[in-house]
Structures are given as structure tokens and as C-alpha cells.
Amino acid sequence: MQTINTFSWIKEQITRSISISLILYIITRSSIANAYPIFAQQGYENPREATGRIVCANCHLANKPVDIEVPQAVLPDTVFEAVVRIPYDMQLKQVLANGKKGGLNVGAVLILPEGFELAPPDRISPEMKEKMGNLSFQSYRPNKQNILVIGPVPGQKYSEITFPILAPDPATKKDVHFLKYPIYVGGNRGRGQIYPDGSKSNNTVYNSTATGIVKKIVRKEKGGYEINIADASDGREVVDIIPRGPELLVSEGESIKLDQPLTSNPNVGGFGQGDAEVVLQDPLRIQGLLFFFASVILAQIFLVLKKKQFEKVQLSEMNF
């Protein structure tokens, strides 16, 4: 009887451990998968500051290029592509949160004019869906449908991101007019260097917090280092914690200065922003322009015919 109870208790403990591990895995994966949009959405009401700077640059410190391509003009209530390109060397590997090396992820924020929004699925053509792949876009806020975010997603597959955009119709949205509008984009590749709370990630360089001598370097069991520095000013011991990931540059007995790099900078990614312009074109203007061109062409044709007729009359008079 006691053996049966013991077996049941062991079975219960194993089941509980597996359940807890599964829950932690799901939470961790969700946190990693949603990190890029959540960091910006939780910390800022608007991703573009009054200065024009996109807030993602607060966490992604390195400056890298980004490119956006949109049509020169679009008609009301039509779907068009906004193609964002986030170029980088596909051979590069970044430091992951666990200290290991892995591929770079990418993410983007697209700030559209008021009234422009993500196209509904039933308005997207099969060709455009093929370009989009399996990406899932979301709005920055429920009340900001004109600001779209995506990522992080694998950079190997999505260094070029196609956003399906629905142009507004001034006939149904009175605050929208037939004008030229700006579009802003921010794109990152790789992990950030600073978290929104101001703490450093393991994807950045770590500097000394004191001037002195490195007395001892302790390699931590789960990775990373504890660097004990004897402060030159008062002899007290300062401990700098280095997470797993960055490579150590100093050794025991070495003299170091305040703010001297203790590690290499493992960051291979960065953030960039750009802009483009799109004209919301009035169909009546296009019809008027086409009518004008047709009138000019017809006038040219009639002029040529009239000239030929005049030449024939002149020729007949000369013969007479």
C-alpha cells in the first residue's frame, strides 16, 4: 500500500514539473516573439517623437540603413504595396539572450497618414499575399490604425517586408483630402542594446565602473563573469557583473580606467529610419488630364490633316 502511495506521489511530482516547465516555455516564447512591438507600444503613446526621431532608436543604438518604396500616386479606396527593405549581411550571427549565437531578427514600424490603414484580407490580391508570406501585422494602438508594427521575424526570410495598405476615400472620410502625404518607416535588424527600463542587454559593450586593478575574475556557472576591481582611490572592492554573451577583454592583475571597455561589443545589428511621399489622387483630375491629352492629340491630327488639305489645294492651283 505504501509502495503504491509513493509511486502516485512521484507521478504527481513529475506531472507537476512538466506542467510548470511547459508554462514557463510558453511564457518565455511569447515574450521573445512579441518583444519588439511590445517594447515600443508599452513605453510610448506615439512611436515618432516631435523631433521626427522614431523611438526604436532609444534601444537600438547602432545606425543602419532602411529603405521604403511606395507608388508615386494612389487612387481612393484602393490597395497598394509599401515595401520596406532592411538590408544586412546574412552571414552575420548575433548574441541571443541565452548567450549563444544565432540569426538576426528584423522588425519594422510603418507610420502612415491619418486615414490610411492595413488592408483587410478580402481586399488583398493573391500576388500581394504571396509577397507578404506568413507575416501578421498589427496596429500600434486600437485608435491608431494608421501605425503598423511587425516583428521580430527571421531576417533570413523577411529582410524585405511588404505591407498591404488601403488608401482612404475622401468621399466617406471628410478629414481626408486629395493631397501629397508623408510616410515614415523605422526598421531594425538584430536585438537592442538597452531595455525600456534603461538596463543593458547582453548585446552591448560593458565598461568598467571604477579605476583600479582587476583583482579577480569569476566565471559564473550559468555563463558570464564577476569582475572584482580594487578601486585605486580608496582601495574598496567594486564588482562588475558581465552577462553571458560578450567576450571578455581584460585579465586578472590588469590596470584599468573608469569607463574602459571590459568586453567586446557583440552587436552586429542596428536601427534606421526613412520616409517617402504618396499622392492621394483625385480620379476626376486624372479624367480631366486624359481629356486634355486627348484634345491635344486630336488638335494635332486635325492640324496635320488641314495642312495636307491646304497643300493639295495649293498644288492644284499651281497645276491649273
UniProtKB/Swiss-Prot annotation:
| GO CC, alphabetical | chloroplast thylakoid membrane
Q: GO molecular-function annotation terms?
A: electron transfer activity; heme binding; iron ion binding
**Per the record's keyword annotation, is Protein biosynthesis included, yes or no?**
no
Cofactor(s) for this protein?
Answer: heme
Its primary localisation, in coarse terms, equals plastid
Residues where heme binds: 36, 56, 59-60
Record's subcellular location: Plastid, Chloroplast thylakoid membrane
Bilayer topology? Single-pass membrane protein
Which free-text remark accompanies the cofactor?
Answer: Binds 1 heme group covalently.
Q: Which domain of life is it from?
A: Eukaryota
**UniProt keyword annotations, A-Z:** Chloroplast, Electron transport, Heme, Iron, Membrane, Metal-binding, Photosynthesis, Plastid, Signal, Thylakoid, Transmembrane, Transmembrane helix, Transport
Entries under Pfam families matching the protein: Apocytochr_F_C, Apocytochr_F_N
Signal sequence span per UniProt?
Answer: 1-35
InterPro entries cross-referenced by the UniProt entry: Cyt-f_TM (IPR024058), Cyt_f (IPR002325), Cyt_f_lg_dom (IPR024094), Cyt_f_lg_dom_sf (IPR036826), Rudment_hybrid_motif (IPR011054)
Q: GO biological process: any one?
A: photosynthesis
Which residues span the membrane? 286-305
Q: Cite the HAMAP family for this sequence.
A: Cytb6_f_cytF
Q: Assembly and interactions?
A: The 4 large subunits of the cytochrome b6-f complex are cytochrome b6, subunit IV (17 kDa polypeptide, petD), cytochrome f and the Rieske protein, while the 4 small subunits are PetG, PetL, PetM and PetN. The complex functions as a dimer.
* Name of the protein in question: Cytochrome f
Species for this entry? Spinacia oleracea
